[in-house]
């Protein structure tokens, strides 16, 4: 061994530290370097002239304002990188690109308020990460994607806002083998000082929906009904001024709805479809000229009129509904004339024939078929009395009860949620109502101001139970059922364009997209698209 080597061994044995100076130009100003490590303090910018074999680098109180992409490409051998008491506030994407051997990354006691979602990309050997004591209010989703070797993460000392932006972090923590120190929330006020790991992700409501305008169908309409035929969704509109039932289908080339077939039907108020195997039926309820049944026996044929329905009973139909009784399809047509009567029409052979007359002389405006306690029921609304509930027994409908405190109800629609049956009752002026079935009676649950309402339509779209309250004088309101409260809460207004005298709403899923149809009496039918928005993104 040479003399210099022996001297170094003796000095080391005596406890004397001898700083190793790399070749000239390999230890920047304001840095202290040893053979495999460097400490830089007070440097005005990011030092770069290090030995390419450097293993450890500490940067303290530098003048760096941000870490840009590729900041450490010249020292790919780093195993440890430490930042403390620096003034930089932003870490950009790929700031640590090229550091595939880095195991320890400590970014502590700095002024970082923003870190890009791909800032840590490529750190495939990282085991220890600390972002403690910075100014981070949130972290971008997927920040830790690809960091499969992490064993320790320290996020303490940051003023996290515990809103939807941290939801992904709460969901991520249980899925990794790393120990994670998260610290406490700085806000909102209701969660201030609560430890992040005590938060329940299930309590966060971070999903929003929006209905945005998609398409206009020119003529006005009174009803809109979805149906599926030969595996393809369709819509049929009752267009009284155009004198037809218009069937729409999806144009896959133009990505829009287009007319497929129309059925001449003067003064039509409702077009009700029924699919039985290869056969398609459409009931066209008309104010004048008699209601008709149209049929298509098999695909490839056009719909053709096959039957005039109960001409002596259906004098002024106002609504038509489809229901199944003892395995057979039936239509119920609500008749609004004093001389006519609401009629139940059931299939018999090739046609549909009167099975029962209901509620004569009451000028019914609406019929709603529903199931209560496992049995078919029918609810009729009329201009002369409160809605009446009928139940199916002995092969016919018998009166069961009426709905208390429900005067001047124009129409009723029901929906199910959480095992309960709810009822939406439409009133033109005053308060429309939401009721819930208690096993023997519908009880009032909620009242909503009506301003010229002819429709209060519940719709289940994706995971959301919605209800739309139409208005002839203002914007129609979309409401959503909040499961925690069991009440409908305002979601949005429909428009622009504003709906002009809306009369019916329907939902259809087409090509993986969800659409809402709004049939309007004094304006064109409007189509809206349903969008889901992730607020935690």
Swiss-Prot record:
LRR repeats (start-end): 53-74, 77-98, 101-122, 125-146
Taxonomy, superkingdom: Eukaryota
InterPro entries: Cys-rich_flank_reg_C, EAR, EPTP, Leu-rich_rpt, Leu-rich_rpt_typical-subtyp, LGI_related, LRR_dom_sf
List of glycosylated residues: 177
Residue windows of the EAR repeats: 210-252, 256-298, 302-349, 351-394, 396-439, 441-483, 487-532
Listed PROSITE patterns: EAR, LRR
Places the protein is found: Secreted
Keyword Glycoprotein assigned: yes
Keywords in alphabetical order: Disease variant, Glycoprotein, Leucine-rich repeat, Repeat, Secreted, Signal
Residue ranges of domain LRRCT in the record: 158-208
GO terms of biological process kind: adult locomotory behavior; glial cell proliferation; myelination in peripheral nervous system; neuron maturation; regulation of myelination
A GO CC annotation given for this chain: extracellular region
Short name of any one Pfam family annotated for the protein: EPTP
UniProt main location, coarse: secreted
Secretion signal span: 1-19
Keyword Zinc-finger: no
Disease: Arthrogryposis multiplex congenita 1, neurogenic, with myelin defect: A form of arthrogryposis multiplex congenita, a developmental condition characterized by multiple joint contractures resulting from reduced or absent fetal movements. AMC1 is an autosomal recessive severe form with onset in utero. Most affected individuals die in utero. Those who survive have generalized contractures and hypotonia. The disorder is caused by a neurogenic defect and poor or absent myelin formation around peripheral nerves rather than by a muscular defect.
Function per UniProt: Component of Schwann cell signaling pathway(s) that controls axon segregation and myelin formation.
Complex and partners: Can bind to ADAM11, ADAM22 and ADAM23.
Name of the protein: Leucine-rich repeat LGI family member 4
Organism: Homo sapiens
């Amino acid at each position: 061994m040479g003399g210099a080597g022996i001297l170094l061994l003796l000095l080391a044995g005596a406890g004397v530290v001898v700083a190793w100076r790399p070749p000239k130009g390999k230890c920047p100003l304001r840095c202290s370097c040893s053979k495999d490590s460097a400490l830089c303090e007070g440097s005005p910018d990011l030092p770069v002239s290090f030995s390419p074999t450097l293993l450890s680098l500490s940067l303290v109180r530098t003048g760096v304002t941000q870490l840009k992409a590729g900041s450490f490409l010249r020292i790919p051998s780093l195993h440890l990188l430490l930042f403390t008491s620096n003034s930089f506030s932003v870490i950009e994407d790929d700031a640590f690109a090229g550091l595939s051997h880095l195991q320890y990354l400590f970014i502590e006691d700095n002024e970082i308020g923003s870190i890009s979602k791909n800032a840590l990309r490529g750190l495939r050997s990282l085991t220890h990460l600390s972002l403690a004591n910075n100014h981070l209010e949130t972290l971008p989703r997927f920040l830790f994607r690809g960091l499969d070797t992490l064993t320790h993460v320290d996020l303490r000392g940051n003023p996290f806002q515990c809103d939807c932006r941290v939801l992904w972090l709460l969901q991520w923590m249980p899925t990794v083998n790393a120990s994670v120190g998260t610290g406490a929330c700085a806000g909102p006020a209701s969660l201030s000082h609560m430890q992040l790991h005590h938060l329940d992700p299930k309590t966060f409501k971070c999903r929003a929906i929006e209905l945005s305008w998609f398409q206009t169908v020119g003529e006005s309409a009174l009803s809109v009904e979805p149906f599926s035929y030969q595996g393809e969704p369709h819509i049929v509109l009752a267009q009284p001024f155009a004198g037809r039932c218009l069937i729409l289908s999806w144009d896959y080339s133009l990505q829009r709805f287009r007319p497929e077939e129309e059925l001449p039907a003067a003064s039509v108020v409702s077009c009700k479809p029924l699919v039985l195997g290869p056969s398609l039926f459409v009931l066209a309820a008309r104010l004048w000229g008699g209601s008709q049944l149209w049929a298509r026996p098999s695909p490839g044929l056009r719909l053709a009129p096959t039957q005039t329905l109960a001409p002596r009973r259906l004098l002024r139909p106002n609504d038509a509904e489809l229901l199944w009784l003892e395995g057979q399809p039936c239509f119920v047509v609500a008749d609004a004339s004093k001389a006519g009567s609401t009629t139940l029409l059931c299939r018999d052979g090739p046609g549909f024939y009167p099975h029962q007359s209901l509620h004569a002389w009451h000028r019914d405006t609406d019929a709603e078929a529903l199931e209560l306690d496992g049995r078919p029921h029918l609810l009729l609304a009329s201009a002369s009395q409160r809605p009446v509930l009928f139940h199916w027994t002995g092969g016919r409908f018998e009166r069961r009860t009426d709905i208390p405190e429900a005067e001047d109800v124009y129409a009723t629609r029901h929906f199910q949620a959480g095992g309960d049956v709810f009822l939406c009752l439409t009133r033109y002026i005053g308060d429309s109502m939401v009721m819930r079935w208690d096993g023997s009676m519908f009880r009032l649950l909620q009242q909503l101001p009506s301003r010229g309402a002819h429709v209060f339509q519940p719709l289940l779209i994706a995971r959301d139970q919605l209800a739309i309250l139409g208005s002839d004088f203002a914007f129609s309101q979309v409401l959503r059922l909040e499961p925690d409260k069991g009440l409908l809460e305002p979601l949005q207004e429909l428009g622009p364009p504003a709906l002009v005298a809306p009369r019916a709403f329907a939902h259809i899923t087409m090509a993986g997209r969800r659409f809402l149809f709004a049939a309007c009496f004094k304006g064109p039918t409007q189509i809206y698209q349903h969008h889901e928005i992730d607020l935690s993104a």
